[in-house]
Amino acid sequence: DMLVDTKNLKIFLLSNSLYPKSKISFEKFEIQNTNFLLRLKEYNILRNYFHNSKSKPFYIKKSKVFVIDENDETLIISPIDKINFTTSKQDDFKKLNIKGNLFDLNFKSLWKKKYVSQKNSQIEIDFNEPNILIKNQLNYNNNSNFNGLTSINFLNQKIEIDYNVKNNQITLKSDNNNNIQIDTKIELSPFNLN
């Protein structure tokens, strides 16, 4: 279970939901100065929420995310300046913007997904110092069958890696014009690296 310790929660209700016998409906909510405890086993629940949710926007400010393992040991503490989750049928995207810090590195992240795609998504993670930009395009079928393209910009170098996960095998391949060339297959069951 995800645990939340908050000191400041604001819920913005639609005015027509205040009348008697009406369903309460909110427009958005904001949370500030909150500690979120996220267990690793809850990752898929959170992922499915963002992919499948038709929820209203939410905003989180000046909070911390604690990632906890199955033994209740803290693996990661990430201070968050802000998180914005918005859904808009007008521009046909769900978007999750995060500005925070991970392992003493400031970052900005944008995840977005079209309403019409089932599980396909894009993510950009931009670290300030050192200046690293990571972009990923994911085409998702199911947990054992997905592929995508990851692009990493670092020190004026760009590396693009195509990846494919299918039938317990991971294939990684980079273009020949990259300074770093990758062409490998990893068998997951039994584990074997080629």
At which residue positions do the language-model features occur?
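Strand-loop-strand
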Residues: 118-119, 130-194
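Flexible beta-edge/linker motif
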Residues: 1-71, 76-79, 86-101, 108-110, ...
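Short beta-strand segments that buttress and anchor functional surface loops
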Residues: 1, 96-100, 122-126, 149-152, ...
